[in-house]
Amino acid sequence: MLKKIGKIFRLLLFVFIGICLVLFVWGEIDRTVAEKSGRFAHQPSQYPIRQSDITMYTDGKQLNNQLFSDIKKAKDYVHISFFSIADDKVSHQFLDLLRQKSQEGVEVYYAVDRLGGILLKKKERELLVKKGVHFTYYNKPVFPYLSASLDHRNHRRISVIDGRIGYIGGFNIGKKYLGEKAKLGHWRDYHLQIRGEGVQDLENQFVLDWKKNSEKPIPIHSATKEKGKTSHRFTAYYSGEKLGQDYAGLFQQAKESIIIVTPYFIPKDKTIWNALVDARKRGVRVKILFSPHSDALLVKEAAYPYIRKALKQGMEVYGYKEGVLHGKAFLIDENVLMVGTVNFDSRSFHLNEEMNCYIHDPVYISKIKPVIDVDLQNSKRVTSSDVNQLSIKEKVKEKVAKIFEYYL
């Protein structure tokens, strides 16, 4: 009897592995054909240098309180998109607020990525539309490039209220982003509130994304052009080499230090990686702060090979200890600060639609540097033994992660 059960188990395992391999090969072929066709090729939107007042939020509760407060005060319109939304108390409060503002006569446009928004129930969508909210999914799967279209996600998180206030960063909607999921614990992230000239660029990008994904018309408003104190520039990426060129170009300018903050460290991009290696050869101190504790599968194991390479090059790697670190940023010589939606991984570098804010204002950077320093202090420096002396289970997971690292 046991032999029969064992035989059935081995057969099922063989079938499962076979199906996975077929899907993987099909996905690779589909992605390659799609890339050659240019189906997902778009030039990035590089906006002019602007002057805005910028506030960075690292705590989900504080961000939610401010964002919800700004939405409640909206008089004319709300444009808002997130990569994902949960199905919990926090998300229900958010959706109720959008419906309420629509009923008050405010034009509400809400979008969520099709895969990231998979937990958004049909009844919630229907109630949004019933209450007058304009709703669409971003990047719905399409034929004939089904696998490739599933890969290309809209990872931007743009909010615009009355053309006066904008938001962009790493937070999504759900209680885990407030640190209220016991399994994940404290959630640390970076999200910007923008007041000033830069709001018009966030609104313009939202309108571009909306028109790309929906036939429902969306008006173009006259966002505020009042100048703030901080000099910055937005760039929206649709995937491809431009992001790598931007990062490499900035890293090549480094003279003293580069600090990278990322939840995932899977830098499978030769242009970016070579720029970091060259920086080390010039004597630039390179620090990488990532999150070993994560809400995503296999990303820690996928990072191991790159951590080993980084350590061999003399880079310093730190693992955040206080929960989940989901912020996306880098700081170069305390002269250039990037905060945005781009993770340091292949998905953000090559597949996702992303948006970054590049800040060149020394006064503002001097205020954010201590925030990053605190996160480094709340981290453990990774040594070679940490990534070389792995258990058998971790070694197996690393091998599996290596196969799928491009998509993680």
Q: What do these predicted ranges mean?
A:
Residues 138:
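A short acidic/basic microdomain associated with nuclease active sites
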Residues 2-134, 142-156, 160-408:
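Charged, low-complexity intrinsically disordered terminal segments
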